[in-house]
Amino acid sequence: MKIAFLVGNFPVLSETFILNQIAGLMERGHQVDIYALDGPANHTEKVHPIVEKYNLLKHTYYSPTPPDNQLLRELKTNELLIDNFGRNPSACRKLLDVSKYGKRAKSFKLLYKAIPVLEGKSYDIIHCQFGSVGLMGLLFRNLGLLQGTLITTFRGSDISKYLKKWGDQVYDQLFAEGDFFLTNCEFFRQRAIQLGCEATKIRILGSGIDCSKFAFTPRYFPADGHIRIATTGRLVEKKGIEYGIRAIAKLAQVHSNIEYNIIGDGSLKEDFQNLIAELGVGSIVNLLGWKQQKELIQILDKSHILIAPSVTAADGNQDAPVNTLKEAMAMGLPVIGTFHGGIPELIENGTSGFLVPERDADTLAEKVSYLIEHPELWQSMGQAGRRRVEEKYDMHKLNDELVEIYQQQLNSKSTQSRVEQLTSSVVET
């Protein structure tokens, strides 16, 4: 199959779920082109090994980024029009139609995003990662810039935070005209249905991990009594890391033998540094920054407990069953998450770990303390977590399932086309 992946920025180090799907499709012999509508990811020296192994940048087409300065934007837009208007005059006019597209046309954003597909391209599948990207994919298809079966995956912020900003009707046209939809958990599937998506047009396809890269190790109480607790995730509000830090500060009052390592980076780094200093836990709480997968595995391998205190952010942002939790569970770590978004679909409360209410540092501290005091639970919880991930989130199984979904949609469209042709022939006679 010939497949177009439409994404925002690319490659994003934290979006391994997208990289895994692209690599899986390539391994299965399919052609994948990647369209990064928001341009390259923010500069970082670290590049995910999958990007290099599969030479993904060679298959990536970037939309130019509009300058923030209005004058510079107008100058650059004039250059773009001079260079590209002849490729598709009709589409360029439509993309600049303020009466139809409002601010998106007036700001020239639609034109910028469409530059890589102006001449029109045909695919078997157009797979849009995130609902907001699905809106652009639908627009491109309606303008004749892309042809193919349109599939959109909802992953979290696009069906939580995005709704709060743009309203519950933002996906009405996409639900009506898109061919099929995927989501990574039942929590967000039900939300899509509540918003108007037909239940028969959407199914769950979890975000998978390569279990073979996360070796299972039974956890035992360390001989030196030093307990290492970890959290992995971006330093943003919805990851709830503030409550992890507060819980550890409470815990340190009764357990002097703990260490808390936070792996990740983000906009709240300075806030967390200040909180750590304010609570006086700088000697036991470490902000380690972003780590390559190999480095992450080394840290988790030496850890005993992982906490993921996700919360619903002020902007409405929510989490699905996050891959960082799956990776820790695959490695045998007992985990503590929250009753939040899709997390309860991953963690079996009391079996592979514990769930606590959002923003409840006291209960989080109690559960961590309970695990420290009951190390006999670690091994059984770790084994249950590994089984859960292997059964529901194995990347290779899910990539096979993705190919099956693509094929089902193509077959359905082919059957529908034949029925329409037969109906037309009968009417004519």
Task: Show where each model-derived region lies.
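Conserved acidic donor-binding segment of nucleotide-sugar-dependent glycosyltransferases
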Residues: L346-G350, F354-A361, Y370-E376
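Carbohydrate-associated surface elements
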Residues: F187, G208
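Short hydrophobic beta-strand element within catalytic cores of glycosyltransferases
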Residues: A328-A330, P334-G337, I347
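Conserved donor-binding/catalytic core segment of Leloir-type glycosyltransferases
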Residues: L182, P218-K239, I245-I248, N261
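A short, well-ordered alpha-helix in the C-terminal region of glycosyltransferases
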Residues: V281-I284, T363, Y370, L377-E404, ...
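Acidic donor-binding loop of glycosyltransferase active sites
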Residues: I284, D301-G316, L333
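Acidic anion/phosphate-binding donor-loop and adjacent secondary structure
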Residues: K46, K161-K165, I193, A199, ...
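Nucleotide-activated donor-binding/catalytic signature segment of Leloir-type glycosyltransferases, i.e.
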Residues: Q273-K294
